[in-house]
């Protein structure tokens, strides 16, 4: 039997495969290049802060302390188990199981990262202040502002590593299992490139999750400068719930008494609008999240975090550590 004929001296199957991956690369380059650039920019900024500033020594120590905490390993293990188990559980969504799985996976990553951030802020800031450890640190050539900034950066980069770990795991599960299982149930066939393009749809969600966690981390650090863990956890939970409901509060207050409208608009102004970081609707509608939307939310997160960190400086400036 003759071998398969060659086209231009190349195997046609190999040429088709190379063309397919070139199309995938162009798709990634056009839609997700901002993610790669933003991630490397963030990692470069963290590297500079960690190794070229006095704040970095506190940030590195905070990250090491957070990673060694049992709750970090527990949430990492529980989150991984949930992602793996949900991959095999049918959602009975009439062909949209992959969308439901992505939504549940991003929610799992968000909750796990938030719990780590709030818990670490309470331990690393509030208990160090109450246990007089902070006074020992501040007796060295480290200012109170560097202490707060170092704690925030350390907690934020801890959640970043957790989100990246979960993100890689979720992409692998969608690429290797979930997309193919969903297609098989619908009597369809998906190529590896199609499975990978489906898996990469979570990248905007991961970016939005980190922005939301960064905002909540700054709030938790600010509260920890004055209040103990229980109050911190309760307040952050309330801010998280109300922050996701602020658009609803504003809409429902229209036409009501002026006082109710004033309170709703005040809450919407002071508290972060966390619903902007929710991409459940985009997943359900199979809509693409544009890069400018991510950019606007990144700018909003940066401004809000900066304001809360400044508030933390004010709250901690006259705190008695003796």
PLM-predicted stretches and their roles:
Residues 70-91, 108-115, 232-244:
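Hydrophobic alpha-helical transmembrane segments of multi-pass membrane transport/permease proteins
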Residues 231-232, 240, 317-322:
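Short cytosolic juxtamembrane segments of multi-pass membrane proteins
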Residues 52, 56, 118-138, 142-144, ...:
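Transmembrane helix boundary and interhelical loop/hinge segments in multi-pass membrane proteins
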Residues 26-51, 84-124, 148-226, 252-255, ...:
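Secretory targeting signals
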Residues 1-28:
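Short, strongly hydrophobic alpha-helical membrane anchors
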Residues 53-72:
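Aromatic- and glycine-rich beta-strand/loop motifs that create alpha-glucan
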Residues 65, 126, 137-139, 220, ...:
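Helix-capping/transition residues at the boundaries of transmembrane alpha-helices
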